[in-house]
Each structure stands twice: as structure tokens, then as C-alpha cells.
Amino acid sequence: MISLSIVIPAYNESQRIAETLKTIIHYLEDKQFDYEIIVVDDGSTDRTLEIARNLSFQKIKFLENKVNCGKGFSVKRGMLMAEKTWILFADADLSTPIREIEKMLGFQDVDVNVGSRAMKGSQILIHQPSYREWGGRFINFLVHMLVVPNIMDTQCGFKLFKKEAAKEIFSVQTIMGFGFDIEILYLARQFGYKILETPVVWSHHADSKVAPFRQGFQILWDLCKMRARHRHTYRK
């Protein structure tokens, strides 16, 4: 039986959190997984947490940030709390359908499996606006050249970890905003974990909270600090 934790960072997701959780639970129950879902509310100012709790699903756990601390902070809290053999973090909008986890779980010898929108075999059902796509490609190009070569898409919010890898990597994560994905992949490389990139299905949502230009510059700044901070980070 597959043992799986799913971490969902959520900020002002009251319009879809219930449907997201119902979709995930229906899938996991149908597959008869041993599972837990961890919702990390990142200081939402709407009814996200209230709605999620009112569903009263026994296998959902909740963490609450009293103020908005960033996606990276929220994912880190959830990953360090997770208890199952495999740990997935997924965006609250399910831009990558939960069923895509089946592809990743087929590679049992991999420590970190990265959902990718850029690989051959990926399928983009709804594209981002062109300025977002080009901005994302530019960021990915720089990241590919400077930090994590051979990973084509670092920013897709659908990544699977073995528990042991997740605990070691996220315990030393320092970037708390949207650039955290790059840091955890860099750390995975530094620690010598086996990384695989898997093509997935993905759809853009018009109300995405990613601000490509402002957050793009922040990611680049975070990269500079990260390289200096983790230069000597490796498994002892």
C-alpha cells in the first residue's frame, strides 16, 4: 500500500479549497492509499481555513500561520510535519491534477521527483499569458545555467519526496518566498539525492497569485544569497 502525505499551502483559497480537498480525497480513497493531507493556511484573510475545517475529514491536518509568511515557509512547515513514506507538495488550485502522482510513484528508486511542464510528454491544457511564459522561461534559463543544471522546470508546484530526503532538505531551507523550489533542488543535489523530472499535465488559472516580474526579481536575488549561504552545505 502506498503511504503518502500531501502538503497544500493555501492563501485566500476560500473559493476552491473545498473542491480541491474533495477531489484529492476521492482520488486517494479510490486508490486505497494510506494517506494524510496537511493544509497550511498562510495567514489568509478570507474563510479558507474555516471552510477546510468544516469539511470534517479525519485525515486532514491543519497548520496556521497567523500572518502571511510566504509559500516557502508554509511548504516547509507542512513537509517537516508530514509522517508518511512519500511526501508531495501540491498547489491549492490543482493546476497539476492529483492523478499525475501515479507517474511519479512508479519510480521507487528516486528520492526527489519534480513535476515538469517543460519536458517532452508534458501537456499544457491552458497556457499562461505570453508575458508570464517568457518571464518563466527566462528565470528557468538562469536557474538552469547557474544553480541546478539539467532540471528544465524548477517552479511547477508538484514535487514528490521520499520522507528521509524531505526531512533533511527542508530542515535547512532558508528561502521562504516563491524561490524556495530552486533552493530545495539545489540542496537535494548538494546532499547527493537522486532527482528525476517527470512530465505532467498542467493548466494555468487566471487568478494565480504569482506576480512574475516582482517575484522574478526576488527569486534572482534569493539565488545570489542562496549560493553564498549553501556553498559548503553537503551531507557529512
Feature names for model-found ranges:
Residues D41-L49, L94:
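A conserved acidic beta->alpha catalytic loop
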Residues E13-L28:
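Short, well-formed alpha-helical segments that are part of the catalytic scaffolds
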Residues F180-L187:
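Short active-site alpha-helical segment characteristic of glycosyltransferases
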Residues Y35-I38, L49-M81:
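Conserved donor nucleotide-binding strand/loop of the catalytic core
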Residues N65-M81, W86, I98-F178, H204-R214, ...:
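Acceptor/aglycone-binding surface of glycosyltransferases and processive sugar-polymer synthases
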Residues E13-R16, S44, K71, P97:
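Donor nucleotide-sugar binding loop of glycosyltransferases
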Residues S3-S5, E36, E183:
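Cell-envelope/extracellular polymer assembly enzymes that use nucleotide-activated donors
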